[in-house]
Amino acid sequence: MSRINFGAFLAPHHPIGEHPMLQFQRDLDLVEHLDRLGYNEFWCGEHHSTGWETIASPEMFLAAAGQRSHRIKLGTGVVSLPYHHPYNVAQRMVQLDHMTGGRAIFGSGPGALP
């Protein structure tokens, strides 16, 4: 019998003017909660809009999430490749995968186009 998998994508939209530490804390609490509920995957992307989209580095956020979760896979949805050298992206993803015990999933895309 097939098993249904569940995942969540975090669009990091927060109230403008809210303290960034509070925003990160809430987002990390969400990952922890999803892990406890048995979700299979959690995804977050790279956003550079100031104020309400605060995750400029999904790898850094997911490394923190990996320390607070145990089973859920953690995906970059997406790393905006035009902004980064491919070698650096590969190195960060390898490190993230090691730090999360093999739970990292790589997703890439063009990001916002001019």
Language model features by range: what are they?
Residues 1-76:
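N-terminal beta1-alpha1-beta2 module of alpha/beta enzyme domains
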Residues 2-22, 83-114:
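Flexible, glycine-rich active-site loops centered on histidine and acidic residues
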